[in-house]
A protein has these predicted regions:
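A noncatalytic interaction/capping subdomain that flanks phosphate/NTP-handling catalytic cores
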Residues: 2-185, 198-204, 209-350
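Conserved lysine of the Walker
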Residues: 189
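Post-Walker A alpha-helix
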Residues: 192-193
Length: 350
């Protein structure tokens, strides 16, 4: 969205000199103090969103920021009674139309920084569930970049620190029994999740699952409203053909984002109760489902925890509770075979 006529950006102003202050006093002129660090930028637009069901308050001076948040989170409703995460997003003027570089993320104790350049960055305090984001108009115009690196990363960082344990896994369910599909990048989590959904399973998420703290029976939530595929998935799913291939400022691998809307013949759910964990390996000599060592599963889950030191024990306890389920490795080549083998696992327990 382009800047509207009502969106007036307040430029940084240097402090007044002594002479300017004297002149204003002598002539009884109104004084407008300088604000070189934009500390008084008005954030006069506000909306509440519920990504993955958690409340997030967004305050900003830009309608385009709210549009971006609405695009990513507009489908979600409040599911979890938590104190709202607070994002304050200030947008500044610039003359560029170039997308900023990929941010560099660093964390120490309860502070997280996400810095693209001197004008585009976020600072998050996990202990207070608050983030301040500064972005240029050029960054916000590149909506996919802005959503992914600033809105989603800060909000989900707060969620995964205090409210849930983030797991690099897809999630699908059959007969109300959820399966986490785990594995390295490229193992096929998204394609197998989507193939299961087309075979009548319930789709929860493609590769970002969150094990919710304080909920019974290993409750996982995820973004059931979209899936992000590698371009090579066009050969597997015709509905991906012709869609834009996105690459976020050179970060990561190119992807195709597919919205999954209600009524498009795929059953979705925002949550599932996990009964099985399955680690995926593709391009194998022999297709089979075999037991997977839990100690390796524990290390896989532990290595992605990003939280304050005093929150670590809560995450480790959640992971150990999750690992009480049966854990397997699915070695496969054919999506059809993999879907049928997972169905057998749910129906027969082996």
């Amino acid at each position: 969205m382009e800047q509207t006529e009502h969106e007036e950006r307040t430029p940084a102003k240097e402090l007044l000199t002594v002479e300017q202050l004297k002149r204003a006093w002598l002539w009884s002129e109104p004084v407008e103090f300088g604000d070189p660090i934009l500390a008084h930028t008005r954030l006069d637009r506000h909306a509440m969103f519920y990504p993955l069901g958690f409340p997030v308050s967004v305050m900003t001076n830009s309608d385009a920021v709210l549009d971006a948040a609405r695009e990513g989170w507009g489908w979600f409703t409040c599911r979890f009674d938590r104190e709202p995460i607070r994002l304050k997003v200030a947008v500044t003027e610039d003359n560029s139309r170039v997308c900023p570089p990929t941010p560099v993320c660093r964390m120490r104790d309860h502070m997280v920084t996400n810095i693209a350049d001197s004008e585009n960055f976020a600072v998050t305090d996990l202990s207070s569930q608050f983030s301040t984001i500064w972005a240029t108009e050029a960054a916000v115009r590149h909506r996919d970049y802005f959503r992914y690196f600033f809105l989603e990363s800060t909000a989900m960082g707060c969620v995964s620190s205090a409210h849930a344990t983030a797991i690099h896994a897809g999630c699908v369910a059959l007969d109300d029994e959820g399966i986490l599909l785990c594995g390295d990048s490229g193992a096929g989590k998204t394609t197998l999740s989507y193939a299961c959904a087309h075979a009548g399973w319930t789709y929860v998420t493609d590769d970002g699952s969150y094990l919710v703290h304080g909920e019974a029976d290993r409750l996982v939530t995820g973004n059931c409203h979209q899936a992000r595929f590698r371009p090579s998935a066009e050969a597997l799913f015709p509905q991906l053909r012709g869609r834009e291939v996105m690459r976020r400022a050179g970060a990561g691998k190119p992807s195709i984002e597919l919205p999954i809307k209600p009524g498009n013949a795929i059953r979705t759910s925002a949550t599932a109760n996990v009964r099985y964990m399955v680690f995926l390996e593709r391009n194998v000599h022999k297709e089979e489902l075999t037991p997977f060592p839990r100690v390796v599963g524990r290390m896989y889950l532990w290595q992605t925890i990003r939280c304050m030191p005093y929150e670590t024990s809560r995450h480790l306890k959640a992971i150990d509770a999750l690992l009480e389920v049966k854990t397997f490795e699915l070695r496969y080549n054919s999506l059809e075979w993999a879907v049928e083998r997972l169905k057998q696992l749910v129906r027969e327990g082996r």
